[in-house]
Amino acid sequence: MKRGWLIFFCALCLCLFGCAAQSGGGDKPALPQPESTPSRAQGTSAAQLVPERLSKNESGVPMLRGYDVKSETLETLSVEDYLPAVLAGEMAGDWPLEALKAQAILARTFVLQFVSQKESMYDGADISTDIKEAQAYDAAGVNARIREAVKETRGEVLNAGGELPYAWFHAHSGGLTARAKEGLDYEKAEPSYTQCVKGMENDEAPAE
């Protein structure tokens, strides 16, 4: 259990928070500290963060209208059915289960936050499989480990002061992440929960 939480928070820190590196001699300015830190939300607390525009199935799971760019079709499916292909598109299916679980929480937060803040570029859709719009999507790459990661985190999202945070993540930080305004050309005010995160001691990019 401790190992699982450690991996989760390492992934969370590397995926969500960022600030620019400082260079030059002399004393370095203190790195900005976050005003708040997103926490895991599940059950009733997570349900309260689901965008009102989304309908729910008989089990209370949010439903999405997803546009598949390959088949050029619009399909209605639950968030939980949408996530496995997203994980397969973003991570290798043989990664440690705890890493996949962390990514599942990030991906679930990402799609719900997207729906609450944006409109899909495809008519009638809440989100699409277009990587230019949202997350990678690879239905053919889904395996048992990925399905288990989604199942074990069912309904869990990140909660930042009663709101869904921007669940940004990356494949490799290069040793130090950048804050949203610098790394993503983010035009709004810097989110209160972003901060500088250095890479792990062994911060090598995994083989594709």
Predicted regions, residues:
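Conserved, single-site charged/polar hotspot
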Residues: 1-208
